[in-house]
């Protein structure tokens, strides 16, 4: 077998292991993450309600508020990516949710390319074309925050814990690990939102945001 075939086989085995271990413990895990009962449930619920209020405030802002450049703003307001995010609640396994997260990111790039990409001038087939402005990490994060704020996930906080803390570590590599970090950063921005600040943490040039305590 080739290296790619070994990698696929290994990944399939890890997914099977995750399914066998996570599903029987799912109810307990959700309780521990705040979706069930327990002595700290009231505080967790209050924190999540506060986060959702802040998320609604961010969702009410236009793309320009998050400093999304005009060359990156979406005429469709990233509706395809938001719809993908909404579908995450249809999946149980952390790896399945993480896979949706990666698809959301790809959809953002695809939407940007489609809406700001090849733009024929005139009617001939040899017309010059306009190339989309490249999207760096510092450009991607504000868009991702916009999409996260406007999606309808039942619990962003629980989803964050499931993806970042309960998924098998060996699966948290490459794109999956990178966009899980983006999810953390987006949640951190929303959790620290005060309704006045108009920056998405670009002062350091890294595109980082406040760290979430959730």
Residue ranges and their predicted role:
Residues 1-10, 121-127, 206-214:
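Acidic, serine/threonine-rich, charge-biased low-complexity segments
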Residues 1-109, 115, 119, 178:
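Catalytic and GAP-homology cores of small GTPase regulators
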Residues 20-27, 141-151, 158-165, 185:
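Short, hydrophobic/amphipathic alpha-helical patches that form generic packing surfaces
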Residues 33-34, 114-118, 156-158, 172-176, ...:
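Intrinsically disordered, low-complexity regions enriched in proline, serine, glycine
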Residues 37-45, 156-169:
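Short alpha-helical "patches" and their helix-cap loops
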Residues 88-156:
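Extended serine/threonine-enriched, polar tracts that run as long, contiguous segments within proteins
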């Amino acid at each position: 077998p080739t290296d790619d075939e070994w990698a696929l086989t290994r990944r399939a085995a890890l997914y099977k292991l995750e399914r066998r271990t996570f599903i029987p413990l799912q109810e307990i895990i959700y309780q521990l993450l705040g979706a069930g009962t327990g002595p700290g449930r009231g505080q967790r619920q209050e924190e999540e309600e506060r986060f959702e209020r802040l998320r609604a405030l961010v969702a009410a802002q236009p793309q320009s508020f998050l400093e999304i450049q005009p060359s990156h703003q979406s005429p469709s307001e990233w509706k395809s990516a938001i719809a993908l995010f909404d579908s995450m609640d249809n999946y149980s396994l952390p790896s399945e949710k993480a896979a949706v997260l990666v698809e959301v990111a790809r959809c953002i790039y695809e939407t940007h390319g489609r809406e700001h990409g090849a733009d024929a001038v005139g009617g001939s087939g040899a017309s010059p074309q306009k190339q989309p402005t490249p999207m760096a990490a510092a450009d991607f994060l504000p868009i991702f925050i916009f999409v996260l704020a406007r999606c309808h996930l039942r619990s962003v906080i629980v989803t964050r814990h499931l993806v970042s803390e309960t998924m098998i570590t060996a699966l948290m590599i490459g794109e999956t690990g990178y966009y899980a970090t983006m999810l953390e950063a987006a949640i951190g921005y929303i959790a620290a939102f005060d309704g006045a600040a108009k920056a998405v943490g670009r002062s350091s040039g890294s595109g980082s945001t406040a760290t979430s305590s959730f």
